[in-house]
Amino acid sequence: MQRTYCPRCGGKLEKRMHEGRERDWCPACRVMHYDNPVPATAAVVLDHRLDLLLVRRGQEPGRGKWCLPGGFQETGETPEQCMLRELAEETGLQGRIRGLVGLEMGQNPFAGEVLVAGYCVDAVGGALCAGDDATEAGYFPLERLPELAFRSHARIIERAAAPLRPRRRFRGLPGGAYVVTSLDHLAVAREACRGGARIVQYREKDAPAAQRLATARAIAAVCRESGTVFLVNDQLDIAALSGADGVHVGQDDVPVEEARELLGPGKIIGVSCTSLEQALEAERRGADYLGVGAVIATPTKEEYPVVGLEGLRRICRAVAVPVAAIGGINLQNAAAVKESGAKYLAMVREFQEDAAARVAAVNTIYKK
């Protein structure tokens, strides 16, 4: 900010070099004045599809362009209070702060240098409606954002989007083989990745926790090297500690929302379903994909009702998220299961031997 007179005594200021910068100096009261950035906040609000909430600015700077909800911090309020107030004023939404994304510097032609604190915020109430100096409010895919008003906001978005890569990458994953490990889990995972598996799920319930974690970490490393999605069955702690891309849970396990709360917004969450009702509910709760089965009677899923190809077809038509079919699938019936709408074919026994070749065979079905 440009100053002419001393705010202490009213005397005329002079420019002096001090500590490597040109600063305002008052010769009357012999005080050096320092410029400090103005504090502001910005909210990163994502919906269950990972679309980002933006508002269109109704005034300068950046009038007509889009930005994150936020604004300048007022005296007497904390940055967190400022963030929630601005979110409510500009979008009509009530928020709950998940955490700090980071701090970025920006320039404002009226306020000078601005220190922007970006927060990840969950929308927990209210109705979306533009207000205050925002003329519009809406959600946008991270891959197709409109022109942004502030570079500081763009950098905050980049920071917030980085941990979301597993879920974002999962959206573009091609269909094919979904390998559920058994027996020698690491060996199966290695062969699965060598054959081009789309997804590897580590399912082990009987080994000691320390052994399960060590195995999961080893599989995670193999999957990272090959670019294969790695999930852990049921165990959120093992998934988090091993660096897995996500977790697969059953109907009686931790709900999707709580799993998301524990693992963070970037992890993939799949849910087992045996009926259309369960599938629709899991999708509503924010599941990234559905594991549907048993499609055909199988000894590894004896406690599950048989969904059948027609039941699988109904579910695939009713939901927007991808479906992984499981239960009784082998290379002989894989094509028929794929034709029912399943994006992934999940198998256990079929991949216990010659996993690489059988994975490649399944993927070939999806290329036809």
Which positions does each model-derived feature cover?
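Glycine/Thr-rich beta-alpha phosphate-binding loop at enzyme active sites
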Residues: 240-249, 271-317, 358
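Glycine-rich phosphate-binding active-site loops on the catalytic face of alpha/beta enzymes
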Residues: 204, 251-258, 291-303, 338-365
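Unchanged
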Residues: 73-97, 102-168
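Conserved N-terminal beta-strand and adjoining loop/helix that marks the start
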Residues: 28-52, 72, 103
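Catalytic cores of alpha/beta
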Residues: 230-245, 274-286, 318, 324-325, ...
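Conserved Nudix-box catalytic region and its N-terminal flanking loop in Nudix hydrolases
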Residues: 47-89
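Short cysteine-rich clusters marking metal-coordination/redox-active sites
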Residues: 6-9, 26-29
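Alpha-helix-loop-beta-strand connector modules within alpha/beta enzyme cores
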Residues: 213-231, 251, 257-274, 305-325, ...
